[in-house]
Amino acid sequence: MRFKDLAVGKYVILNRWLSKYSNLYCETLEIISTPDTKEENVVGCRRVTHDGCVCTNNKYADEKITYINYIHLREVDVDPYACLKWNKGDVLVPTEIGVDRLSKPQLNHSPYVVVEGTIWYDRYRDRNDLRVYIAPSDGGAYSMLLNVSYFKKDDNAWRGLFASQYYKNNIKFDENGELVKPTSVVKGSPVYNQILKEAKACGVVKE
């Protein structure tokens, strides 16, 4: 980050791996103090995620304040707490940070779909972490734990996702407009309803 962009309350992440802060490389931090001059260059930060997950009962992951030279920080371009409002079936796309951090195979499976969100209680820290699991929208079998700085919800992604999968014959409807492929999607589920909505919008299924 640049000095002029620093502000208390901004969310940041390390812009590269540093051995001194190796345990913070994948974590989102909040700036809680800024230097008065460029020469001081040290920013006070507190960690808001644990394993990339936010907490529902305590804003910070621990009591520690970490002081980092601001040149090693990068602003997080999404609200890390947006995931608290996500639902099963929501479509996620990588953020700019996600594009830089995710592996090529992981990026090739984008966009992703929210599979489930569970509360995991860490009794050592008295912290309830929201652990959101996501899976590739292309039918990949594996799911992975969401890092809140790596993905964002995209309401417009469904249209492109539907079109690409339909023309690859990964999505099929019968003559009555009922979804028959993929068979794993349950009728009436959020994903089923979203697919049907996009099919009608694209004229594949008639109203």
Write out the residue ranges for each language-model feature.
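Basic/aromatic-rich interaction segments and small domains that mediate binding to polyanionic partners
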Residues: 18, 22-60, 102-148
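Intrinsically disordered, low-complexity, charged/polar segments
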Residues: 50-87, 130-205
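Short, Lys/Arg-enriched, disordered terminal segments
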Residues: 1-3, 207
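Compositionally biased non-globular segments, especially hydrophobic aliphatic-rich helices
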Residues: 10, 31, 37-40, 69, ...
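Short coil-to-beta transition motif at edge beta-strands of beta-rich domains
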Residues: 4-17, 84-100
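Small side chains
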Residues: 44-45, 92-94, 117, 195, ...
